[in-house]
């Protein structure tokens, strides 16, 4: 049981060390993430549209 408590303490300590890095996310990072998601979805839809047109013989 002692090793489990030691592992738990190590995990909690590592999470506390990582936490300030997570808090450093700013509004610019959030905007960049949302823009990336929107552009990725748009690109996927464009590729699906091209595939559908080729499959139907319209291109």
Curated annotation (Swiss-Prot):
InterPro entries: DUF4730 (IPR031742). Disruption phenotype: Following challenge with vesicular stomatitis virus (VSV), there is increased production of cytokines including Ifnb1 and Il6, reduced viral burden and higher survival rates than in wild-type mice. It is found in: Endoplasmic reticulum membrane; Mitochondrion membrane. This is Small integral membrane protein 30. It holds the Pfam family DUF4730. It is a single-pass type I membrane protein. One of its GO terms (cellular component) is endoplasmic reticulum membrane. Residues 51-59 are cytoplasmic. Interacts (via transmembrane domain) with antiviral protein MAVS (via transmembrane domain); the interaction disrupts MAVS interaction with RIGI and inhibits MAVS aggregation, resulting in the repression of type I interferon signaling and innate immune responses. Residues 1-24 form the signal peptide. Keywords: Endoplasmic reticulum, Immunity, Innate immunity, Membrane, Mitochondrion, Signal, Transmembrane, Transmembrane helix. It comes from Mus musculus. It comes from the Eukaryota. The chain crosses the membrane at residues 30-50. Residues 25-29 are extracellular. Negatively regulates antiviral innate immune responses. Disrupts the interaction of antiviral protein MAVS with innate immune receptor RIGI and inhibits MAVS aggregation, resulting in the repression of type I interferon signaling and innate immune responses. GO terms for biological process: innate immune response; negative regulation of type I interferon-mediated signaling pathway.
